[in-house]
């Protein structure tokens, strides 16, 4: 099966990159609300989100990757791009990730790009209540990737320190309070995952977790291939797995977001693909923060099915053979924070093959 064709319109993405550079100089680090959900000013607008919600431009062979921010978006994009090309890495090595899987809701979004070839691969962080309405009467497919929300908090906190469009996260305690109240970009993690899980059981919806990919990447890739109706032979499958490890993505300038201007993503202050691990929250949460999170989680997720991160919160998955080489020097949400972490048992995180995050705006998140 043929995957999407590479660059369709001469000069389109050159113009796009110019737009990004101009926009990135004007990011105020403030939020506006669309139907109650917070969005960063600059990369999003009322008009761009309304277009994503109300467009009729949905094709039956469209593939949507849906995540809450910092839940594995980059990883899933890389995997699906490789699947669509039957393991051939030339596409992921030559075309920026935001061009391969443009965002639905950014001001230069997937639905505003002309003449895209099928099948289209698109990304979104939108909660289900404002996602593209036309999808729900189509045969288009959604892959929703979840992640331990404790790891999401840590990753989003660090990302907020380098992303020009986001508010300064403040202290670790303040950021955790904001996260638990849904006062962060794209709103409540709890509402996001609970909303999308209403789709579970439908033929065009796949729910998979970061932790499942970490524990069994090859098996997870085979599951995704089955969902997409794109089975791969042994050699192609091995290539998908090999080229979607954390180290492979971190070394790929088309996937690690280092092509973005510092005003949008300041890599001098930290890497977008930071560690690529599961369980890193144990190196950052204080006991008090962990207890506060657990209380909110139990209340919000009562009646929901068990997730991989619920089975034993003190146990991590098996280690990845290619862990990130960069150790975190001080255990806290932020280095040198005044919040000292009390000792926790079994607090060593296990490396994972890839960390996602996120961007047709090359909005990494």
From Swiss-Prot:
One of its GO terms (cellular component) is cytosol. Phosphorylated. Gene3D superfamilies: P-loop containing nucleotide triphosphate hydrolases (3.40.50.300). Substrate binds at residues 98, 103, 125. It holds the Pfam family Sulfotransfer_1. Belongs to the sulfotransferase 1 family. This is Sulfotransferase 2B1. It comes from Homo sapiens (Human). The lineage of its organism: Eukaryota, Metazoa, Chordata, Craniata, Vertebrata. The gene is SULT2B1.
